[in-house]
């Protein structure tokens, strides 16, 4: 664990140098949000990504006299080291002693009334990556529902979307709403959390159509064309920008027996299986923090390494089902290749049916073109940043 924490620390240093120095995140704009918290009991949804320079937003708030009564933690926990989907218990922050209420403890993703009774304002400062199935925004929506139910204020300290230049992929059919899909948005929605919160509030997407008293503290120096490089890896299996850019296309392997590199140094940028009959790349997933029991643990997998692609090409492809189709064919098109989780990730049942019937990636892409155009029009009133 100490070795893993050291790696995370070193990675955060490298990513910090790569971050866009011209962008100021919402959490750094204290003059704009501290007055909104004055004299109020504040809960903070954050994790290891909630940094302003080398200081965590929690510490920054406390240093400025904010009365933080509760910390809400998302998937991977407040420190960001738990496995994907792992239940994370609550407790207390070791440094500050502030209670941590886990929203990923396996029981409920709605905070208890007793917790909400000790809160006036919920603040959000967490780094999202702009994917419909990335759970940080889902946790934000759950908290917005709680705030609307209990009459609490809601503040989003905005951060750039590293995939904010792209809008692509199937729009979620709400029949398949789940813990990896809360809103009728494309796989790549191209919005920041602040913009997404405004859209959910404005479009009546919160439970029972309720609205929350919402404030968004925007970034400065950011546009949707900005190639923003994250200063801190957002979760254990997105260790670098290539993983972030490939995630929209390779995450679908989570619903198959194919390894997407969890348990290696290259998650989401390789894929393979012991029974694949194509590809010239071999790897063996091992147990490690953030991937304690990865698919195909300890087995030598044959497949493909996508890391030779340029970042430009990774971004340009948007959502690409070519890799899933390739693996499916290379394993002989087995009947049990897809689990029911695939529909939740894809957002509909149609894509699985098309793959099984032999459709190409381009034929699949054509199915969401009109929906993406309609979404782009619908989201325009909620955009805080120029699109170019």
Give the label of every model feature segment.
Residues 1-23:
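Bacterial Sec-dependent N-terminal signal peptides
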Residues 69-77, 157:
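Short internal beta-strands
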Residues 80-85, 155-177:
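Glycine-rich, charge-decorated loop segments at or immediately adjacent to ligand/cofactor-binding or catalytic sites
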Residues 89-119:
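Glycine-rich oxoanion-binding loops at beta->alpha junctions
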Residues 128-140:
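Glycine/threonine-rich flexible loop motifs
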Residues 177-248:
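Conserved anion/nucleotide-ligand pocket segment
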Residues 220-297:
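Glycine-rich, aromatic-lined ligand/substrate-binding cores of catalytic
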Residues 267, 271-369, 373, 387:
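Conserved functional hotspot residues or short segments at active or partner-binding sites
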